[in-house]
């Protein structure tokens, strides 16, 4: 047998192929390689493993690496990847294309969306990617009637008995189906399914829901009046038949496996029934193997037990392991209580002594030290004999060793004082009265509404609905509605909302993006509205640096009562940058003689000939009326650039022109531009009139462009794009810079004013001449750096992602977005991953998992806290990933942090939420590899002294791919 080493792995799998483009350090590539190798070794002698790396460490690529090794070793093997839903299914399928540089799966990968499609694909393709949501189909009456009729056929129930069952099912609304002609999932005949009907309709020795025959034999006809039991039996039959019709799977990969923790959920039952004994090996991916309690692992192991050839005593092994974990947790809690009760002076002495020499620490003269050492020995024994070996038998988990250094957790203490706190007090009294009158309500949920926003509280059930409110509580509700209404319409702001707005806007002013997680829809929408409104006020302040006394209606457009548009300074100046009859049109466009052929200086020496040729070309064109009557700088630019490029090639015949240069020399360039295609960027330059103006020397020099223009320094990046995409990108960015919500125009005028230019009025020619100087100012450099960073990100995306970016929020210049905007997750992701707008993304639960939002964001706000620490970690994992902005910045500045903000309104449920989620996080962290930490998970006024570093390292459970050196 071949020895599996890194060298062997690299002979066919190059996990580091994209390391440089994606900013992945070599050490992480090696860790991923080690993970793949260890996973393959583990799968040799066990049915399944958990790949549980912390969020953002590349589990997807590790899983693809394991799939690649499986296909390499067994070219005929079948692999199924089950994803959490349609969006992530598309993402996984797309990852195979990106993975091609590392290992080429060829055309063997197929996506599936529905169960029937999955069965067809899995029978005909070696690798299939399918969402677990495909199992949620089959609720329709047609599918259920077919399965009941199939049962009648198998059971040989005819006439009155079958009709009596149908009469009891769904109120007798459905009719029997002729199973001789009908097909299972629209594809499988009676002959296909008949061999598997006994397994489908009888539970036998398997666990789970009872079969239809079990119900009938036990309860007769009346059993079919229990709709829940019948539905479960029908689902069971559907899942069993699906599994029996599916070929054997060699490797089953399950993404976000923690979603299967609930044994009663439909997706968990489906996975158990469909894949029972239909796979040989399985790989479960999750950064949070358990969320609220370690016993959630039991469900994962129960799925491992469904593998073909799984050991019969697997369940007993698991129960023994969980019992050991319980003992370990009790010992740990005792140790924490003892340590916390130590005199701080003694604790400091112990810590210092233990870090030098544990034996010396044992000699300290204090009775508590002996107890401490007994706990340490007990923990060490349990860890080494059962806990670490038990986890390592089934799990690989790599940690971000420096995560606890660069992550900065910042609880923000928000105090609601005076009238601000009145709604909270009345709300509490209202809820208390409901409880006193035995009106059922979920107290925590309604309290969370109130700490989220007044809008969320108003839209909550107990305020929005009138039914069932006791008369004694109604007075509080009426008062609360009145107060909340006055506060929402007045100047008084919700304290947490005010904090969130101020924090995110201040960050945006510094050029930093913010990801806000908010689970209340009303709050999400209110945040978006207010962010846009306040940001407009901040943009106005930038304009006032140029026009100090200007009011909003002088700067921005307004609408009169008759809907007549009154244009402001911003809109008027924006039009000049976009209208090709104004010389400012050239300010943000690409000068091709400086970016494509770099021949502008050469052309200036031959200007007379170029002007002669350009004017001849000009007269061959037919343009619109406006462009015919006066200079159109887009038309003039194309004529001069085409003439100069053709002449340059004539004098340099040895040159092998690029596609872009060829397009520049193509006669169609005159009419359609660099993409040689008629589009929306031609403005008024298309028509049937002959130009009645000529290109002068002054105009020719202007359209050739001055040295130091915007795109000149980015020519190398632009050259990586095809001409059509290049044109679209430059035009869209030129428009983006002039949007109302973007401060570029105000910043430009501010710098122009400082340089002595007139801004009353703004002179186009003077401002255009100033542009190269502007790009050299600190302000201009900042804008240019943003655009360069955008380009660097953009050119590394695939064609689909590039389209998502250009069609996304950047197209409208949206400052803030939320996940209720109807935008696809991918489009929002791509836009947020650029340094341009949106600067703030307000996300709900949809964005918590599976999306990478880390390229240009290192700030996250948990506006609405949750009870589950795994959800908190998944949220943070959106921006804490390999190749993140934080990682890149820390290469040059080790003080850079990833900031995690927890806004907490004092005296409200926020405080309890924070304590509970942090207490639960302790076990998620400690049992899965982090050193024990008593300080971060302490909520007393006097936190205990931190443990010795040496002891923390000794007690940390190591689950990485390589064994830790003794």
What is the role of each PLM region?
Residues 863-866:
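Short beta->alpha connector loops at strand-helix junctions that form conserved
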